[in-house]
Every structure is written in structure tokens, then in C-alpha cells.
Amino acid sequence: MNPSNLEPGLANDSRLLVAAFYAFTPLDDERRETLLSSLPTLARNGSVLGSVLVAHEGVNGTISGPESAVDAVLDHLRTSFDLGDEHYARLEVKRSWAEKPVFRRFKARRKKEIVTIGVASVDPSTSVGTYVEAEHWNALVDDPDTLVIDTRNSYETAIGTFEGAIDPSTESFRDFPQWAESTLRPLIEQKSSKRIAMFCTGGIRCEKASSYLQQQGFGEVHHLRGGILKYLEQVPEAESRWQGECFVFDQRVALNHQLEPGEHSLCHACGLPVSAQQRELPSYIKGVQCLHCVDRFSDADRERFAMRQRQIDQRQIEQHKINRQQG
């Protein structure tokens, strides 16, 4: 993290709320543009950092900052939506805490989809699978007639997943429909499974994945409401079926069962998570290469990465000196 990029007033805060959220609720052009203009102002006034995607189908984001300021952004979103009694009409929020900023800036971006599956007919506001609360998840996945599917990408599943879950080994969520047709459908026929149980980080990908499977006649489809993050928040570790850490899309990289930063860090060359043990390998050079990308880049690339890392290290040293002088 580059401390010089942090918003004023955040650098010394010791406890920041991190809120991951989404809502599938229709937004017309006017309401979408209003959000795109109002959110940055509200975030700046409250020292809130993060990223929010805004589309005609709804919003998807993760933000961090002082609790009252984050709650003000969430309340603003709620009042901007037509939240009724339909299954999709809610702002799904997962809360965790951080000791330092996990984003460098705030961005609100206009998108075609808030999570991209690339199938125009998929609409969670029309059809989704059966929601499963975290407290009931263990009973569902323990049933031998349940086929458990991890809808996340391979770099996420590599550092943690639920016991017995099937890994589609996808590089992008766009790959899920093709995997479902080429691999999942034959697998269901082979195993004679009675139901599918799906999960993802916060629940949003399962909204679209379950909608797709419902459309394509895959039978009984269930998905974990609130995703892995809600499960880790509500289920005691002693009763948990979760193994490993949960990858998150901010500077914490991965969370353990206590929703605290885990042992993984990002390789800034390739952007993939690297465990503490993997950082001890001879192939690992901080900021330059890891076991995932040791043969991926040219010597010129690695020299450029090394120069960038030296600049980052120097800025951190300078910031540390400033903090000591101010302290």
C-alpha cells in the first residue's frame, strides 16, 4: 500500500468498517446517473474508500471507512432503490473490520452488468435458486445427494473452499455457463444428484449462476445467501465446513474464519495470492515474481517490476519517518 494515496483523516484510524454489498433492483437512466454523481461526493465527505459498480440491473460494491460514514452510504443506496417484497429486493450487506484502509481511493463506475456472466437472458430479478441461510448450509452440503459447486475463479478456490466442493477451475465468471453445459450437466446425470448447492464470496455470483441453471433446466438449485463472508460471520469455527482462507477483492487479499486478514498476500507482478510458505520459495522475489508467474514475464518486465518495488519501499520508509516525527 502506498500511504501517500490514502485520503486525509484515514491514515491513523485503527478500526474501519468494510462493507461488501449488492442489490439486484432495476435502475432507470436517471436514477443510475444520479447515483454515479452523488456517491463520490458522499464518500469524499465521509472519508469512505472503495469501489461501486452501477448498472441498470442494480449495484455491486465494497467500501471501507468510519462506521457512521459507511452506514450513511448504505442508507443513501437504500433510499435510492425501490425495495419491495420480491426475493431480490434487498441490499445484501456483509460487514467486517480492518485496522487500516483497504482501498486507495473511491470509484463509482457505470457498467453493463454488476457481475458479468455474459448471458443477456440471465435476470436474478425474474428467477433464482432457493436461498439457504448460513445456519442451514451445513445440513444441506452434508447430504450425499447434494452436489456442492464453488462458482468462484481458480485463483480464489486455490486458497480456500468448502469441504467436498467441486471446483470448475474457471479463469472468469464468463466461463461458468460453458462449464455448466460441458461438465456439470454430465456430472449430474452420472451422480444422479437430487440437488445443487452453490456458493461464492458474497452471494452475487450465485444469483446469476443459479438464475442461469434454472433457465437451462438443471433442476433443484440452492445457493448460500450472503456467500462465504456471511457464513464465516455467523457459523462458529468449531462447526464450520470451510477450509482455508477466503479471497477478497481489496488490500487484505484473504480473510480467515474470524474475518481477519489471513496469511496470503498478492504478487504485484501477476496479481495472484501467495501464501506465507510460497513466499519462502527461491522463485519468490517480492514485487517481481512468484511461483505462479516465474516463467511468465520477460527480463525487461522483471526489471521494471523491481524498480517499481524499490520506489514503493522508499515511499514506505519516508512515510514511516513522517509518522514517527508526528507521533
From Swiss-Prot:
Catalytic activity: uridine(34) in tRNA + AH2 + O2 = 5-hydroxyuridine(34) in tRNA + A + H2O
Catalytic residues of the enzyme: C200
Keyword check for Iron: no
Pfam family, one: UPF0176_N
Disulfide bonds: none
NCBIfam families membership: PRK00142.1-4
Source species, domain of life: Bacteria
Any one GO molecular-function label of the UniProt entry: oxidoreductase activity, acting on paired donors, with incorporation or reduction of molecular oxygen
Keywords: Oxidoreductase, tRNA processing
Name of the coding gene: trhO
Domain Rhodanese: 142-240
Taxonomic lineage of the native organism: Bacteria, Bacillati, Cyanobacteriota, Cyanophyceae, Synechococcales
Descriptive protein name: tRNA uridine(34) hydroxylase
Similarity comment: Belongs to the TrhO family.
E.C. numbers: 1.14.-.-
Role: Catalyzes oxygen-dependent 5-hydroxyuridine (ho5U) modification at position 34 in tRNAs.
